[in-house]
Amino acid sequence: MSRYRGPRIKIIRRLGILPGLTRKIPKKSMKLRSLSLQSKSKKKDSQYRIRLQEKQKLRYHYGLHERQLLKYVRIARKAKGSTGQVLLQLLEMRLDNTIFRLGMAPTIPAARQLVNHGHILVNGRIVNIPSYRCKPQDSITINTRTQTIALIQQNLGTTRKTKLPSHLMLRSTENSATVKQIVSRQSVGLKINELLVVEYYSRQA
């Protein structure tokens, strides 16, 4: 399944607010209609459908292909600790998501573009792989040879009121940041029941 490129408002109307996908919020009338439909179908929802919905939230929020998400689930299953929490850590520590959580980009797709086009350096080297897994003590800076510094500073100004996750440290005046530690469950930027996602993939992973 390819990455979604259709109307994002349709997705958040169905799945709820997904900050990584879009800043848009459904209009009140749309939200009420959606809640009404949800309450009517709540009793009819099968366990499979509930798990599928949680999986879709995760996939659309982080902007992943189905195969990519399944790969992360398989890695999480082999790791020590809670599979669901390890899965969230793997996704949260991706470079594109880290750029988004720092406020350097308004969404994860926008952060992915910054990475793809060579605007981001990790430990002094250009990293153009959005799935790069950030590690504690990684230093993230903006490529001064590009013309995106003004745009990133504008994004930082827009998101200044947003609370920065505890595992990240931002030095906005220096256009740089540091990954202090692995993200905790409390700092994950999405309201999700990861156990349902793991259960969805129980026969595939």
From Swiss-Prot:
UniProt cross-references to CDD domains, sorted A to Z: S4
A Gene Ontology term for the protein's cellular component: chloroplast
InterPro entries: Ribosomal_uS4, Ribosomal_uS4_bac-type, Ribosomal_uS4_CS, Ribosomal_uS4_N, S4_RNA-bd, S4_RNA-bd_sf
Keyword rRNA-binding tagged: yes
Key words, A-Z: Chloroplast, Plastid, Ribonucleoprotein, Ribosomal protein, RNA-binding, rRNA-binding
Subcellular location: Plastid, Chloroplast
GO biological process terms on file: ribosomal small subunit biogenesis; translation
One GO MF term: rRNA binding
Main localization of the protein described in the UniProt heading: plastid
Domain S4 RNA-binding: 93-154
Pfam families, per database record: Ribosomal_S4, S4
Family: Belongs to the universal ribosomal protein uS4 family.
Subunit note: Part of the 30S ribosomal subunit. Contacts protein S5. The interaction surface between S4 and S5 is involved in control of translational fidelity.
Function: One of the primary rRNA binding proteins, it binds directly to 16S rRNA where it nucleates assembly of the body of the 30S subunit. With S5 and S12 plays an important role in translational accuracy.
Annotated PANTHER family: 30S 40S RIBOSOMAL PROTEIN, SMALL RIBOSOMAL SUBUNIT PROTEIN US4M
Record protein name field: Small ribosomal subunit protein uS4c
